[in-house]
Amino acid sequence: MVKEIDINKLLAQENNALNAILSHVNELCKQNKQLQGLIEIQNETKELEKEHNRSLPWFKRFVKTVSNVKYILIKSEEQLTNEAIKYNNKILKDIDNKIYNIAEKSAPLKQALQEEIEKSFKDLTKKDLSKDQRARLSEVFFSYKSKPERFSALHMTNPLQFINAEALEKQFNSLNATKQNIQNLISENSNIKELKEIQKQVAEIRAEVPHTFFEKLNNIWQNVKNVFVNNSEQVLAKNKESNTRTIRKIDEQLYKTQHKFEELIENKERNIKDIIAKLPDNEELQKIVSNLTNHMASKKEPILANVSLAKPLENNIPPPPPPPPPLPDNNIPPPPPPPPPLPDNNIPPPPPPPPMAPVKTLSKAVEATTVKKLENQPRPSIDTSDLMREIAGPKKLKKVEFDPNTGKPVAHSHSKPAQNVNKPSGLESIFARRVAIEMSDSSSSESDSGNWSDVSVNRNKSKMLKTKGERDAKMTTHAQKINNRNSQKPSFVR
């Protein structure tokens, strides 16, 4: 209540200045009376002039009327010439400066002015405006921000109070321009669904301190770039070149703003330390210095970590690694890599293969034995004429009969006469002879002397040489055993 009384007193004192502003608004409406909606605003201006009680509600109505004039002029710019647009912008800037000069004399009135302008802008942007018109409205609407003293009304502690806030004002205006560029980029690529959600986040950044404004805007901008990278196929062909230029421009703006913030923070830190150095030393002051040091260290780390994020997209690609230095001519090649580590279950590696020396010795002994056998004892010749004659001879097929009940073949016994039982057939005798010769040959190869010997006896017994007669008798006995076994088979088995 006390604040409102002070505001009413100030407005009463500034009555002449307010009337001058109303006359400027009225003149602006007359110059653009062909535009739809300005006649109604002109009538509202006349009603405001007739009211002599200049209170806070009256001031809010007055600010809303000026905001409506800006909206109509921006919406109907296509109907105006370039000279008319320049003239209108000049008059609007004069009106804003005069309103701000009155409001800066009272902190409550200045805060009320800012809140009313924000509210009017939020309501007007919901109307039918194109993206270019919305950007122009933002530029015209917040022209009052050209006064750096606006930041003196921020609720900040004394050590962080910026008495001369010109640098912060420049950063804030730069961030507003960057924010508008991001909104325009999102609007131009509205076919990408992911950007619609980010557009809401950008619109929610309002009335921020410059540094927090930058942090929020920078984080959102990284998300926007990620959307473009992951959805490059959805970008329209006509927008690719303009998107590249806009992205590069926004990256440069954020990069410059970030470095400027670093300088401001470092300068403010030095100023605070200079102030503390002049104060008497005590424990509480030491705690403040320690807290300040920790706080500044924590604030600098994320800024430095995000520097690469604010750089253009082309710089985000890491450079290729440098080539390895050339080795000198007399340099020893590097040793082979160490063996791979054991697996998790710690299974030991298989044992190494046994040495090959014994194998080579054995092979040499075998070669020597074989050569010696070939030289000392040649293989006996085998007559294969009987075998070939029996194979080439006529073959008689036997008829196979089947049992009508079971369907299985019936076995017939064709027993030969008793006198022919022990008589071997032609093929059987030939095979028996051949088997006996090969068995005797294999037994002779296993003997150390290379002569024909009996291998069927126990190796522990002393080996004795046999005569040719004994060997022939043994071969005949072995052949008869084979013939007896073959004669005991059924006749239908070959």
From Swiss-Prot:
Pro residues: bias regions: 317-357
Low complexity composition bias: residue spans: 440-456
UniProt domain WH2: residue ranges: 383-400
Cellular compartment(s): Cell surface
Molecular function in Gene Ontology: actin binding
Alphabetically ordered keywords of this record: Actin-binding
Region (Disordered): 312-494
Positions of region (Central and acidic domains): 421-454
Gene Ontology cellular-component annotations: cell surface
Polar residues bias spans: 477-494
Role this protein plays: Recruits and activates the Arp2/3 complex, which in turn leads to actin polymerization, promoting Rickettsia motility during infection.
Protein name (record): Arp2/3 complex-activating protein rickA
Name of the gene encoding the protein in the UniProt record: rickA
